Protein backbone atom coordinates (compact mmCIF):
# COMPACT_ATOMS: atom_id res chain seq x y z
CA UNK A 1 0.00 0.00 0.00
CA UNK A 2 1.32 3.45 -0.95
CA UNK A 3 2.20 5.83 1.87
CA UNK A 4 -0.62 8.33 2.66
CA UNK A 5 2.07 11.03 2.57
CA UNK A 6 2.35 10.48 -1.19
CA UNK A 7 -1.34 10.03 -2.02
CA UNK A 8 -3.45 12.37 0.14
CA UNK A 9 -4.10 15.64 -1.79
CA UNK A 10 -2.87 17.87 1.06
CA UNK A 11 0.13 15.89 2.28
CA UNK A 12 1.14 15.22 -1.34
CA UNK A 13 1.83 18.96 -1.84
CA UNK A 14 3.91 19.11 1.37
CA UNK A 15 5.71 15.90 0.40
CA UNK A 16 6.63 17.16 -3.07
CA UNK A 17 7.75 20.54 -1.70
CA UNK A 18 9.65 19.68 1.48
CA UNK A 19 10.24 15.93 1.79
CA UNK A 20 10.77 14.03 -1.48
CA UNK A 21 11.83 17.16 -3.39
CA UNK A 22 14.94 16.38 -5.50
CA UNK A 23 17.60 18.94 -4.51
CA UNK A 24 21.13 19.56 -5.86
CA UNK A 25 23.74 17.78 -3.74
CA UNK A 26 26.09 20.77 -3.56
CA UNK A 27 23.94 23.75 -2.45
CA UNK A 28 25.76 25.72 0.25
CA UNK A 29 24.59 27.63 3.33
CA UNK A 30 23.67 30.53 1.01
CA UNK A 31 20.62 28.44 0.05
CA UNK A 32 19.39 28.50 3.66
CA UNK A 33 17.97 32.01 3.49
CA UNK A 34 14.74 31.05 1.72
CA UNK A 35 13.67 28.89 4.67
CA UNK A 36 14.98 31.52 7.11
CA UNK A 37 12.80 34.14 5.43
CA UNK A 38 9.82 31.81 5.84
CA UNK A 39 10.63 31.49 9.55
CA UNK A 40 11.02 35.28 9.86
CA UNK A 41 7.61 35.74 8.23
CA UNK A 42 5.99 33.27 10.65
CA UNK A 43 7.65 34.99 13.66
CA UNK A 44 6.47 38.40 12.41
CA UNK A 45 2.88 37.25 11.81
CA UNK A 46 2.63 35.56 15.23
CA UNK A 47 4.23 38.38 17.26
CA UNK A 48 2.28 40.93 15.19
CA UNK A 49 -0.99 39.14 15.91
CA UNK A 50 -0.40 39.31 19.68
CA UNK A 51 0.65 42.97 19.45
CA UNK A 52 -2.50 43.80 17.45
CA UNK A 53 -4.61 42.38 20.30
CA UNK A 54 -3.40 45.21 22.57
CA UNK A 55 -2.60 48.01 20.10
CA UNK A 56 -4.99 50.87 19.31
CA UNK A 57 -4.62 52.67 15.98
CA UNK A 58 -5.70 56.08 17.22
CA UNK A 59 -3.38 59.11 17.40
CA UNK A 60 -4.47 59.83 20.99
CA UNK A 61 -3.72 56.33 22.33
CA UNK A 62 -1.29 54.59 19.89
CA UNK A 63 1.89 55.63 21.75
CA UNK A 64 0.32 54.80 25.14
CA UNK A 65 -0.89 51.40 23.89
CA UNK A 66 2.67 50.42 22.88
CA UNK A 67 3.92 51.57 26.30
CA UNK A 68 1.09 49.54 27.90
CA UNK A 69 2.17 46.44 25.91
CA UNK A 70 5.75 46.80 27.18
CA UNK A 71 4.80 47.51 30.81
CA UNK A 72 1.54 45.74 31.62
CA UNK A 73 0.99 42.87 29.17
CA UNK A 74 2.52 39.52 30.20
CA UNK A 75 5.76 39.21 28.24
CA UNK A 76 4.55 42.13 26.10
CA UNK A 77 8.06 43.64 26.05
CA UNK A 78 9.56 40.48 24.54
CA UNK A 79 6.78 40.24 21.93
CA UNK A 80 7.24 43.91 20.98
CA UNK A 81 11.04 43.67 20.70
CA UNK A 82 10.90 40.33 18.86
CA UNK A 83 8.62 42.03 16.33
CA UNK A 84 10.83 45.14 15.98
CA UNK A 85 14.13 43.22 15.78
CA UNK A 86 12.50 40.41 13.81
CA UNK A 87 12.02 42.98 11.04
CA UNK A 88 15.77 43.66 11.10
CA UNK A 89 16.54 39.95 10.89
CA UNK A 90 14.01 39.68 8.04
CA UNK A 91 15.90 42.33 6.05
CA UNK A 92 19.31 40.81 6.83
CA UNK A 93 18.04 37.52 5.38
CA UNK A 94 16.40 39.34 2.44
CA UNK A 95 19.58 41.18 1.46
CA UNK A 96 21.69 38.02 1.76
CA UNK A 97 19.08 36.07 -0.25
CA UNK A 98 19.07 38.66 -3.06
CA UNK A 99 22.88 38.87 -2.92
CA UNK A 100 23.07 35.08 -3.30
CA UNK A 101 20.74 35.32 -6.32
CA UNK A 102 22.98 37.94 -7.93
CA UNK A 103 26.22 36.08 -7.22
CA UNK A 104 25.13 32.63 -8.38
CA UNK A 105 22.96 33.73 -11.31
CA UNK A 106 19.66 32.58 -9.78
CA UNK A 107 18.04 35.49 -11.65
CA UNK A 108 18.10 33.25 -14.73
CA UNK A 109 14.78 31.85 -13.43
CA UNK A 110 12.83 34.96 -14.53
CA UNK A 111 9.44 34.15 -12.95
CA UNK A 112 10.93 33.26 -9.57
CA UNK A 113 13.18 36.34 -9.69
CA UNK A 114 10.38 38.77 -10.62
CA UNK A 115 8.03 37.43 -7.92
CA UNK A 116 11.00 37.89 -5.56
CA UNK A 117 11.27 41.57 -6.53
CA UNK A 118 7.53 42.04 -5.91
CA UNK A 119 8.01 40.33 -2.53
CA UNK A 120 10.89 42.70 -1.71
CA UNK A 121 8.70 45.74 -2.47
CA UNK A 122 5.83 44.27 -0.41
CA UNK A 123 8.08 43.61 2.61
CA UNK A 124 9.56 47.12 2.36
CA UNK A 125 6.05 48.65 2.25
CA UNK A 126 4.97 46.55 5.24
CA UNK A 127 8.06 47.51 7.27
CA UNK A 128 7.58 51.21 6.47
CA UNK A 129 3.94 51.17 7.59
CA UNK A 130 4.83 49.19 10.71
CA UNK A 131 7.38 51.83 11.69
CA UNK A 132 4.60 54.46 11.68
CA UNK A 133 2.36 52.56 14.13
CA UNK A 134 4.10 53.31 17.51
CA UNK A 135 3.40 57.00 16.73
CA UNK A 136 6.70 58.33 18.05
CA UNK A 137 8.53 61.33 16.59
CA UNK A 138 10.39 59.31 13.95
CA UNK A 139 7.18 57.40 13.09
CA UNK A 140 5.29 60.62 12.39
CA UNK A 141 8.04 62.48 10.55
CA UNK A 142 9.16 59.39 8.63
CA UNK A 143 5.58 58.92 7.41
CA UNK A 144 5.36 62.63 6.50
CA UNK A 145 8.64 62.68 4.56
CA UNK A 146 8.20 59.38 2.68
CA UNK A 147 4.53 59.83 1.72
CA UNK A 148 5.35 63.40 0.65
CA UNK A 149 7.71 61.99 -2.00
CA UNK A 150 4.65 60.97 -4.02
CA UNK A 151 3.85 64.68 -4.49
CA UNK A 152 6.78 64.72 -6.95
CA UNK A 153 4.62 62.76 -9.43
CA UNK A 154 3.57 65.29 -12.08
CA UNK A 155 -0.06 66.49 -12.22
CA UNK A 156 -1.64 63.96 -9.78
CA UNK A 157 1.07 64.06 -7.06
CA UNK A 158 -0.54 66.42 -4.53
CA UNK A 159 -3.99 64.82 -4.85
CA UNK A 160 -2.42 61.37 -4.48
CA UNK A 161 -0.61 62.32 -1.26
CA UNK A 162 -3.75 63.85 0.28
CA UNK A 163 -5.71 60.74 -0.75
CA UNK A 164 -3.17 58.48 0.99
CA UNK A 165 -3.14 60.73 4.07
CA UNK A 166 -6.95 60.89 4.23
CA UNK A 167 -6.63 64.62 4.93
CA UNK A 168 -4.17 67.49 4.62
CA UNK A 169 -1.47 66.00 6.83
CA UNK A 170 -0.43 62.70 8.41
CA UNK A 171 -3.14 62.26 11.05
CA UNK A 172 -5.66 59.86 12.61
CA UNK A 173 -6.97 58.61 9.23
CA UNK A 174 -3.40 57.87 8.05
CA UNK A 175 -2.54 55.88 11.18
CA UNK A 176 -5.75 53.81 10.98
CA UNK A 177 -5.27 52.87 7.32
CA UNK A 178 -1.56 52.14 7.83
CA UNK A 179 -2.52 49.71 10.61
CA UNK A 180 -5.07 48.03 8.32
CA UNK A 181 -2.51 47.68 5.50
CA UNK A 182 0.24 46.60 7.89
CA UNK A 183 -2.04 43.82 9.16
CA UNK A 184 -3.16 42.52 5.74
CA UNK A 185 0.12 42.75 3.77
CA UNK A 186 1.97 39.88 5.55
CA UNK A 187 -0.80 37.50 4.44
CA UNK A 188 -0.44 38.77 0.86
CA UNK A 189 3.33 38.25 1.26
CA UNK A 190 2.64 34.65 2.39
CA UNK A 191 0.58 34.02 -0.76
CA UNK A 192 3.30 35.58 -2.95
CA UNK A 193 5.93 33.43 -1.21
CA UNK A 194 3.87 30.33 -2.10
CA UNK A 195 3.84 31.46 -5.76
CA UNK A 196 7.60 32.16 -5.50
CA UNK A 197 8.10 28.52 -4.38
CA UNK A 198 5.69 27.24 -7.03
CA UNK A 199 7.78 28.84 -9.80
CA UNK A 200 11.04 27.68 -8.19
CA UNK A 201 9.84 24.07 -8.08
CA UNK A 202 8.99 24.23 -11.80
CA UNK A 203 12.71 24.51 -12.58
CA UNK A 204 14.37 23.16 -9.43
CA UNK A 205 17.05 24.98 -7.45
CA UNK A 206 20.17 26.52 -8.91
CA UNK A 207 23.50 25.52 -7.32
CA UNK A 208 26.86 27.25 -6.66
CA UNK A 209 28.51 26.00 -9.87
CA UNK A 210 25.63 27.23 -12.04
CA UNK A 211 25.75 23.91 -13.93
CA UNK A 212 22.53 21.82 -14.31
CA UNK A 213 22.38 19.30 -11.46
CA UNK A 214 19.73 16.89 -12.80
CA UNK A 215 22.26 14.05 -12.85
CA UNK A 216 23.08 14.45 -9.15
CA UNK A 217 20.05 15.03 -6.94
CA UNK A 218 19.38 14.07 -3.31
CA UNK A 219 16.08 14.11 -1.37
CA UNK A 220 15.35 17.32 0.54
CA UNK A 221 14.56 15.34 3.70
CA UNK A 222 16.61 14.55 5.79
CA UNK A 223 19.63 16.31 4.24
CA UNK A 224 18.32 19.84 3.83
CA UNK A 225 15.67 19.71 6.57
CA UNK A 226 18.43 19.23 9.16
CA UNK A 227 20.52 21.92 7.47
CA UNK A 228 17.56 24.34 7.55
CA UNK A 229 16.95 23.57 11.25
CA UNK A 230 20.59 24.45 12.00
CA UNK A 231 20.16 27.73 10.10
CA UNK A 232 16.93 28.41 12.00
CA UNK A 233 18.72 27.87 15.34
CA UNK A 234 21.38 30.43 14.35
CA UNK A 235 18.65 32.87 13.28
CA UNK A 236 16.68 32.50 16.53
CA UNK A 237 19.88 32.69 18.62
CA UNK A 238 20.90 35.96 16.92
CA UNK A 239 17.38 37.38 17.23
CA UNK A 240 17.11 36.51 20.93
CA UNK A 241 20.59 37.91 21.68
CA UNK A 242 19.44 41.15 20.08
CA UNK A 243 16.06 41.16 21.86
CA UNK A 244 17.35 40.23 25.33
CA UNK A 245 20.62 42.17 25.47
CA UNK A 246 20.25 45.27 23.28
CA UNK A 247 16.67 45.57 22.00
CA UNK A 248 17.08 49.25 21.09
CA UNK A 249 20.41 48.87 19.30
CA UNK A 250 18.87 49.25 15.83
CA UNK A 251 16.03 51.62 16.79
CA UNK A 252 15.94 55.41 16.97
CA UNK A 253 15.79 57.09 20.42
CA UNK A 254 13.50 59.78 18.92
CA UNK A 255 10.76 57.18 18.65
CA UNK A 256 10.44 57.19 22.46
CA UNK A 257 9.18 60.77 22.18
CA UNK A 258 5.44 60.91 21.33
CA UNK A 259 4.66 62.30 17.85
CA UNK A 260 4.52 66.08 17.77
CA UNK A 261 3.62 67.82 14.47
CA UNK A 262 5.00 71.13 15.84
CA UNK A 263 8.50 69.85 16.55
CA UNK A 264 10.71 68.39 13.81
CA UNK A 265 13.54 66.01 14.90
CA UNK A 266 17.05 67.27 13.93
CA UNK A 267 17.73 64.29 11.64
CA UNK A 268 14.83 62.45 10.03
CA UNK A 269 15.97 59.00 8.93
CA UNK A 270 14.33 55.60 8.37
CA UNK A 271 15.30 52.27 9.93
CA UNK A 272 18.80 51.01 9.01
CA UNK A 273 17.54 48.65 6.27
CA UNK A 274 16.19 51.58 4.20
CA UNK A 275 19.24 53.83 4.62
CA UNK A 276 20.94 52.74 1.35
CA UNK A 277 17.83 53.72 -0.67
CA UNK A 278 17.41 56.90 1.42
CA UNK A 279 21.01 57.88 0.62
CA UNK A 280 20.34 57.42 -3.12
CA UNK A 281 17.16 59.53 -2.77
CA UNK A 282 19.02 62.35 -1.00
CA UNK A 283 21.99 62.34 -3.37
CA UNK A 284 19.89 63.83 -6.19
CA UNK A 285 19.05 67.54 -5.70
CA UNK A 286 15.81 67.27 -7.73
CA UNK A 287 12.71 65.88 -5.97
CA UNK A 288 11.28 63.85 -8.88
CA UNK A 289 14.77 62.66 -9.88
CA UNK A 290 15.40 61.50 -6.32
CA UNK A 291 12.11 59.59 -6.18
CA UNK A 292 12.86 57.90 -9.53
CA UNK A 293 16.37 56.95 -8.35
CA UNK A 294 14.87 55.56 -5.12
CA UNK A 295 12.42 53.31 -7.01
CA UNK A 296 15.05 52.32 -9.59
CA UNK A 297 17.53 51.34 -6.87
CA UNK A 298 15.30 48.29 -6.27
CA UNK A 299 13.64 48.02 -9.70
CA UNK A 300 17.09 47.77 -11.34
CA UNK A 301 17.05 44.12 -10.16
CA UNK A 302 14.33 43.40 -12.75
CA UNK A 303 16.64 44.10 -15.69
CA UNK A 304 19.62 42.15 -14.32
CA UNK A 305 18.60 38.99 -16.30
CA UNK A 306 18.59 41.05 -19.53
CA UNK A 307 22.13 42.29 -18.83
CA UNK A 308 23.58 38.80 -18.31
CA UNK A 309 26.26 38.66 -21.03
CA UNK A 310 28.40 35.87 -19.55
CA UNK A 311 28.62 32.35 -20.97
CA UNK A 312 28.59 31.06 -17.39
CA UNK A 313 25.64 31.35 -15.04
CA UNK A 314 27.38 31.58 -11.68
CA UNK A 315 30.18 33.95 -10.62
CA UNK A 316 32.01 31.01 -9.04
CA UNK A 317 34.61 30.88 -11.84
CA UNK A 318 34.53 34.59 -12.84
CA UNK A 319 37.12 36.60 -10.86
CA UNK A 320 36.41 39.99 -12.51
CA UNK A 321 32.68 39.75 -11.79
CA UNK A 322 33.48 38.62 -8.25
CA UNK A 323 35.57 41.76 -7.66
CA UNK A 324 32.71 43.92 -8.96
CA UNK A 325 30.18 42.06 -6.81
CA UNK A 326 32.14 42.69 -3.61
CA UNK A 327 32.69 46.30 -4.69
CA UNK A 328 28.89 46.54 -4.96
CA UNK A 329 28.55 45.13 -1.42
CA UNK A 330 31.07 47.69 -0.11
CA UNK A 331 29.20 50.42 -2.02
CA UNK A 332 25.87 49.41 -0.43
CA UNK A 333 27.47 49.48 3.04
CA UNK A 334 28.83 52.96 2.25
CA UNK A 335 25.35 54.10 1.14
CA UNK A 336 23.84 52.67 4.34
CA UNK A 337 26.35 54.68 6.41
CA UNK A 338 25.74 57.87 4.39
CA UNK A 339 21.96 57.51 4.76
CA UNK A 340 22.34 57.90 8.52
CA UNK A 341 24.58 60.98 8.30
CA UNK A 342 23.46 64.64 8.20
CA UNK A 343 23.14 66.37 4.81
CA UNK A 344 26.45 68.27 4.78
CA UNK A 345 29.93 68.16 3.26
CA UNK A 346 31.61 65.64 2.77
CA UNK A 347 28.65 63.24 3.16
CA UNK A 348 26.71 64.73 0.24
CA UNK A 349 29.60 64.13 -2.20
CA UNK A 350 30.32 60.62 -0.87
CA UNK A 351 26.61 59.78 -1.23
CA UNK A 352 26.50 61.04 -4.82
CA UNK A 353 29.62 59.09 -5.81
CA UNK A 354 28.34 55.92 -4.11
CA UNK A 355 24.94 56.29 -5.83
CA UNK A 356 26.56 56.69 -9.27
CA UNK A 357 28.84 53.71 -8.60
CA UNK A 358 25.85 51.55 -7.53
CA UNK A 359 24.08 51.99 -10.87
CA UNK A 360 27.38 51.90 -12.82
CA UNK A 361 28.36 48.49 -11.40
CA UNK A 362 24.96 46.90 -12.07
CA UNK A 363 24.18 48.44 -15.46
CA UNK A 364 27.58 48.98 -17.10
CA UNK A 365 30.58 47.38 -15.39
CA UNK A 366 29.12 43.90 -14.73
CA UNK A 367 28.04 43.27 -18.36
CA UNK A 368 31.43 44.56 -19.63
CA UNK A 369 33.34 42.36 -17.15
CA UNK A 370 31.31 39.34 -18.32
CA UNK A 371 32.23 40.01 -21.97
CA UNK A 372 35.93 40.31 -21.01
CA UNK A 373 35.69 37.00 -19.11
CA UNK A 374 34.07 35.34 -22.14
CA UNK A 375 37.07 36.40 -24.24
CA UNK A 376 39.52 35.22 -21.58
CA UNK A 377 38.00 31.73 -21.93
CA UNK A 378 39.39 31.60 -25.49
CA UNK A 379 42.99 31.98 -24.33
From Swiss-Prot:
Coiled coil ranges: none
Bilayer topology term: Multi-pass membrane protein
Positions bound to heme b b566: 97, 196
GO molecular function annotations of the record: metal ion binding; ubiquinol-cytochrome-c reductase activity
Residues that bind a ubiquinone: 201
Principal localisation: mitochondrion
Gene3D superfamilies tied to this protein: Cytochrome Bc1 Complex, Chain C (1.20.810.10)
Keywords of the record: Electron transport, Heme, Iron, Membrane, Metal-binding, Mitochondrion, Mitochondrion inner membrane, Respiratory chain, Transmembrane, Transmembrane helix, Transport, Ubiquinone
Pfam families attached to this UniProt entry: Cytochrom_B_C (PF00032), Cytochrome_B (PF00033)
Annotated Gene Ontology cellular component terms: mitochondrial inner membrane; respiratory chain complex III
Nucleotide-binding is among the record's keywords: no
Chain residues that bind heme b b562: 83, 182
Cofactor binding mode and count: Binds 2 heme b groups non-covalently.
Subcellular location: Mitochondrion inner membrane
Membrane-traversing stretches: 33-53, 77-98, 113-133, 178-198, 226-246, 288-308, 320-340, 347-367
Names of the cofactor(s): heme b
Subunit structure: The cytochrome bc1 complex contains 11 subunits: 3 respiratory subunits (MT-CYB, CYC1 and UQCRFS1), 2 core proteins (UQCRC1 and UQCRC2) and 6 low-molecular weight proteins (UQCRH/QCR6, UQCRB/QCR7, UQCRQ/QCR8, UQCR10/QCR9, UQCR11/QCR10 and a cleavage product of UQCRFS1). This cytochrome bc1 complex then forms a dimer.
Extra remark: Heme 1 (or BL or b562) is low-potential and absorbs at about 562 nm, and heme 2 (or BH or b566) is high-potential and absorbs at about 566 nm.
Cited PANTHER family: CYTOCHROME B (PTHR19271:SF16)
Family: Belongs to the cytochrome b family.
Function: Component of the ubiquinol-cytochrome c reductase complex (complex III or cytochrome b-c1 complex) that is part of the mitochondrial respiratory chain. The b-c1 complex mediates electron transfer from ubiquinol to cytochrome c. Contributes to the generation of a proton gradient across the mitochondrial membrane that is then used for ATP synthesis.
Name this polypeptide is given: Cytochrome b
Provenance organism: Mustela frenata
Amino acid sequence: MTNIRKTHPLTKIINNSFIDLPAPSNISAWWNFGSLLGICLIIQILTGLFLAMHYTSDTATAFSSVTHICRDVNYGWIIRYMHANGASMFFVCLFLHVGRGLYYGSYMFPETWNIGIILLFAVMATAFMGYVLPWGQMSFWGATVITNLLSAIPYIGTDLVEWIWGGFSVDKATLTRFFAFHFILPFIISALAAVHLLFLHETGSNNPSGIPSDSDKIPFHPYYTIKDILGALFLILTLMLLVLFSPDLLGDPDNYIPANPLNTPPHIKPEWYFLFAYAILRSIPNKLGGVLALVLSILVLAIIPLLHTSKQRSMMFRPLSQCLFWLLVADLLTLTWIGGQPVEYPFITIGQLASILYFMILLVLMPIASIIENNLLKW
